[in-house]
């Protein structure tokens, strides 16, 4: 990661105040690029991930640290590093702060395409998300919630909408939950890259059996949950307080998702549901 956001390299607190994650010296792109075609590239990348996590507590246990795996082709790894080095000047300061976020989103989208139908579990096309956000029109100091947040695209577009309407993109409270561990990590990284402060809970968890935001009342709920999802542990939740309109059927989670969202909606809140 090369962008220094015009803040002094050594001033970690300044980065934190600006909601920008700090990249220590051993994790900066010049260090990685210099080692691209050495036998130690895997170790260099693992050390970079560890250093970033050490200086950014919100990313603790989130970044991959298996690049030194002997089964991983180090020549291919070096070639991937070269692609970024030759395509983007990762060393200069003042890089468009949205560039890395857009790059990250691009790769998530391509990965979702390769996964086929399974890719919909963690990625909703940005055009769909933008449509939801344009309809709901989130505002500054609002609370936005996604109970099946995937890689966090709903939050990215909400922050962009607020910024585009002369608001402060940091003045948004983001809450999400995700059951898949890898996807939860993707969302955490997405928010860090975008400079969005988010509460996704301390770990991944099933939204129905372990609601990580039990008292939340959100102003906006945007979601593309896995409909027709079953089994969803209905038998363990028969007396749950979220089922204001009756216990949802065990056959699929459609009405469980809808009632969960209604339960977490503020009195004047709005829901955007795919």
Locations of the language-model features?
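Conserved Class I SAM-dependent methyltransferase catalytic core
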Residues: 1, 132, 184, 249-274
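Non-catalytic, mostly N-terminal accessory regions of nucleic-acid modification and defense proteins
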Residues: 1-3, 8-140, 199-212
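Conserved S-adenosyl-L-methionine
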Residues: 118-223, 228-232, 237-244
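Short, solvent-exposed loop/helix junctions and linker helices
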Residues: 74, 215, 251-255
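A detector for short, charged/polar N-terminal pre-domain segments
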Residues: 5, 244-248
């Amino acid at each position: 990661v090369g962008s220094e956001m015009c803040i002094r390299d050594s001033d970690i607190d300044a980065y934190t105040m600006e909601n920008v994650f700090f990249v220590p010296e051993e994790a900066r792109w010049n260090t990685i690029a210099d080692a691209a075609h050495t036998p130690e590239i895997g170790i260099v990348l693992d050390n970079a991930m560890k250093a970033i996590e050490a200086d950014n507590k919100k990313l603790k246990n989130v970044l991959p640290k298996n690049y030194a795996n002997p089964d991983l082709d180090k020549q291919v790894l070096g070639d991937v590093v070269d692609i970024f080095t030759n395509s983007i000047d990762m060393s200069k300061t003042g890089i468009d702060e949205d560039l890395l976020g857009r790059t990250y989103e691009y790769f998530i989208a391509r990965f979702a395409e390769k996964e086929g139908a399974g890719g919909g579990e963690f990625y909703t096309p940005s055009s769909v998300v933008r449509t939801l956000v344009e309809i709901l029109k989130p505002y500054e100091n609002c609370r936005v919630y996604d109970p099946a947040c995937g890689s966090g695209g709903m939050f990215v577009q909400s922050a962009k909408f607020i910024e585009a309407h002369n608001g402060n993109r940091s003045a948004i409270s983001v809450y999400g939950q995700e059951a898949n561990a890898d996807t939860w990590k993707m969302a955490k990284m997405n928010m860090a890259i975008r400079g969005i402060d988010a509460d996704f809970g301390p770990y991944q968890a099933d939204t129905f059996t372990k609601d990580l935001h039990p008292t939340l009342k959100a102003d906006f709920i945007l979601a593309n949950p896995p409909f027709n999802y079953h089994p969803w542990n209905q038998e363990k939740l028969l007396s749950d307080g979220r089922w204001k309109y009756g216990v949802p059927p065990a056959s699929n989670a459609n009405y469980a998702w809808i009632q969960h969202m209604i339960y977490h909606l503020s009195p004047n809140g709005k829901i955007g549901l795919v």
